Amino acid sequence: MKSITSIEALEGLYDAPLPSPLAKVKKTLTPNYRKWISLARFVVLSTVGPEGADASPRGDIGPVVTIQNDNTLLLPDWRGNNRLDSLRNIVCDGRVSLMFMVPGCKNVVR
């Protein structure tokens, strides 16, 4: 197995992405993304902080998040194990990623 030590070497192993995967990256929510998020009952909240990365499952019987506007999602923090890993990471480093899943669908929205 060969080690990959540069971005150029990595990209040399793959074809360029097709236009459709590139087109789905948006700076704000689209109507389709808003609908998907409203149907999602499970989301994975991923954060990064001084001790590394963390992925926290969040679910509910109704919508998991509230859409405040096309740039802001509200995700409640339910009582859990009180480890606060994700919240600590957000305080230290505001980068977050959300992966929304809808029951019965094979696709996800990130």
Regions found by a protein language model. Name each.
Residues 1-110:
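Binding-site signature for planar aromatic cofactors or substrates
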